């Protein structure tokens, strides 16, 4: 996390999901105590952050985080079991470090992101879902009680979340 002031407000940017998975309750409580807004930089959570600014929470039916399915999408467990580390590191859409690429290939990353979303947005676990969107263009979906769906879409790039987090342009 890094902290800055902008227009009289205090912001923290969060790029490490593991800290929120383990200490999310405490981190969020500290942010609330210090009147600090935590701004996620991860693409899925940034897309939820921007979308939830305009949605009344009581209108939410379901929230979807998207996953590309990684290099093993569509394979059986037997086929995956026989894959090499090198094959797991060959993500079809994202250029990431080794740890997150392996976490993505095994979907562990998506499990972390569900916990992260619960903490960041005070969402009940039963609202949270994962859907495979192989092109990595849809970053999150919010289904409303009236049946409509809000989608946050962009090319698979971290440029928008990073630019927002670094510049603190207010959405």
Where are these regions (language model features)?
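Short acidic, glycine/serine/threonine-rich loops at helix termini
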Residues: 24-27, 50-54, 74-79, 140-144, ...
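C-terminal substrate-binding/catalytic lobe of Rossmann-fold NAD(P)-dependent dehydrogenases
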Residues: 121-130, 134-168
């Amino acid at each position: 996390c890094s902290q800055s002031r902008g227009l009289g407000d205090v912001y923290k940017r969060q790029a490490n999901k593991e800290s929120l998975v383990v200490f999310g309750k405490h981190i969020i409580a500290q942010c609330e105590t210090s009147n600090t807004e935590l701004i996620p930089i991860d693409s899925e959570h940034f897309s939820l952050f921007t979308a939830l600014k305009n949605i009344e929470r009581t209108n939410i039916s379901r929230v979807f985080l998207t996953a590309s399915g990684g290099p093993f999408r569509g394979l059986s467990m037997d086929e995956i079991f026989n894959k090499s580390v090198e094959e797991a590191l060959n993500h079809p859409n994202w250029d990431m470090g080794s740890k997150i690429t392996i976490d993505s290939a095994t979907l562990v990353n998506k499990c972390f992101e569900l916990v992260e979303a619960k903490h960041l947005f005070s969402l009940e676990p039963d609202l949270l879902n994962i859907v495979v969107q192989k092109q990595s263009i849809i970053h999150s979906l919010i289904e409303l009680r009236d049946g409509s769906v809000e989608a946050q879409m962009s090319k698979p790039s971290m440029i928008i979340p990073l630019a927002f987090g670094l510049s603190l342009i207010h959405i």
